[in-house]
């Protein structure tokens, strides 16, 4: 009798505990309950709506290894310090034309999957998974990869972005519903890539029916007016890049990069689709008009002179800095190679140079440590071979901090500047960036021309790349024996 008397109380307490646990989980995910649904139910809903569902992958794209294996023609100006991931997809139902890039020769488990892919105008790609662990920057961005030019009778790489990326300041996740401020790292998200409004709506309906909150669903538009969609050899190919930079916990970052992320579906509708093409999306506007960084020009000139004074016994060659890449829409119109550009940064570069293994021949890279100003997410430089565009080494804002104070010990502006030595042999000095000669694309041979590329990422106020002319350009001096 006593046990029966306490049973309702026990059940009530159990129910209350369960409710509190659910509420707590919902609060941690951004308030309003779990936003993630059931993938199996989502797939069933898609198939009930007539879609053919094929599974792909989101995993690492090792540019240097791909080049060394002869699978790609260059390294595309890769950011030496920031890894890449990409979708790897099967061909569409009925597609008979191969795509152009697959890593299956070095990863046999990826046989039948392609890093670039052709798409029908009514198809979609869906990613369901977690954002990366805490880092300085991440994004997801669609590109036109290869375009056929009938006047030339050949296909050429364009590698131009198709709009603004979904980045860590704009993406909708459980921690940042609808892109609001919050905890964006290690959060559930959904990304739909498609060119068609109707298909986007049908995919969202299937997601909703499977329990997914629209607060975490993002549509990354492929603008059909700028591309040629279809499955034939003369149609464009596409690629999605997932960029990541400078993990707070390096081991967590390595674990993320080493594993296949989330679930990727290629969705192909059955029957005839009445197309409802998206317009070209608006771009976020670069620049705020804040030119405070330009006030550091005097201090930068003092740093320049201090560097020359320190190495006054050597010959100094000033290497000019210029704008390296513009944006994907420029490349699409002009038929030039944008090298996988990203609207969230600016790209600057130095003149070409060669660097011998003479200990008296080296570079001093210097400039404003742009992130120290407080406007940007990160900045870095990379060293490239000019022939194959292989980024092999570099430095970023955290390790550059304080490096100018050696030259300007009494100037308070030195905290906003940097100076870094680059040489063939560092002699074990961690403050010197070493340029190896190989093996393969992991180095730059002594007789091959090289250059420096500079990036400044993601202005916090605009959530896009900086405006070039609000910056003081990074600089480099080559020193060599007299």
Model regions: which residues?
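Hydrophobic helical h-region of N-terminal Sec-dependent signal peptides
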Residues: 9-20
């Amino acid at each position: 009798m006593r046990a029966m008397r306490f049973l309702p109380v026990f059940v009530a307490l159990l129910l209350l505990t369960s409710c509190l646990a659910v509420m707590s989980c919902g609060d941690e995910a951004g308030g309003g309950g779990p936003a993630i649904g059931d993938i199996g139910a989502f797939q069933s809903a898609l198939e009930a709506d007539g879609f053919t569902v094929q599974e792909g992958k989101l995993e690492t794209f090792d540019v240097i290894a791909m080049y060394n294996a002869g699978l790609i023609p260059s390294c595309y100006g890769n950011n030496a310090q920031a890894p890449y991931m990409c979708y790897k997809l099967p061909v569409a139902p009925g597609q008979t034309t191969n795509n152009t890039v697959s890593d299956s020769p070095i990863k046999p488990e990826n046989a039948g999957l392609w890093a670039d892919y052709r798409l029908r105008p009514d198809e979609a790609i869906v990613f369901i998974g977690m954002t990366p662990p805490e880092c300085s920057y991440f994004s997801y961005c669609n590109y036109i990869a290869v375009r056929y030019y009938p006047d030339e009778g050949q296909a050429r790489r364009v590698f131009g972005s198709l709009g603004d990326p979904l980045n860590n300041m704009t993406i909708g996740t459980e921690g940042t519903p609808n892109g609001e401020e919050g905890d964006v790292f290690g959060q559930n998200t959904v990304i739909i890539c498609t060119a068609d409004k109707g298909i986007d709506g049908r995919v969202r309906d299937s997601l909703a029916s499977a329990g997914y909150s629209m607060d975490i669903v993002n549509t990354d538009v492929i603008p059909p007016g700028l591309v040629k969609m279809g499955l034939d050899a003369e149609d464009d190919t596409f690629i999605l890049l997932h960029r990541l930079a400078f993990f707070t916990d390096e081991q967590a970052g390595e674990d993320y990069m080493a594993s296949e992320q989330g679930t990727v579906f290629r969705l192909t509708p059955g029957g005839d689709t009445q197309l409802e093409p998206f317009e070209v999306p608006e771009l976020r506007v670069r620049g705020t008009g804040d030119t405070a960084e330009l006030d550091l020009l005097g201090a930068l000139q003092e740093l320049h002179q201090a560097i020359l004074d320190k190495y006054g016994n050597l010959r100094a060659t000033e290497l000019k800095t210029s704008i390296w890449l513009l944006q994907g829409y420029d490349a699409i119109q002009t038929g030039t190679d944008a090298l996988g550009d990203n609207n969230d940064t600016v790209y600057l570069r130095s003149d070409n140079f060669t660097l011998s293994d003479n200990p008296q021949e080296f570079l001093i890279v210097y400039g404003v440590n742009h992130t120290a100003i407080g406007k940007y997410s990160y900045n870095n430089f990379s060293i490239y071979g000019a022939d194959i565009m292989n980024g092999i080494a570099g430095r970023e804002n955290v390790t550059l901090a304080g490096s100018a104070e050696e030259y300007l010990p009494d100037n308070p502006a030195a905290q906003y500047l940097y100076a870094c030595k680059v040489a063939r042999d560092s002699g074990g000095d961690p403050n010197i960036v070493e340029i190896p000669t190989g093996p393969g694309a992991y180095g730059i041979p002594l007789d091959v021309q090289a250059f420096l590329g500079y990036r400044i990422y993601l202005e916090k106020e605009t959530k896009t790349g900086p405006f070039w002319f609000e910056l003081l350009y990074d600089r480099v001096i080559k020193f060599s024996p007299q």
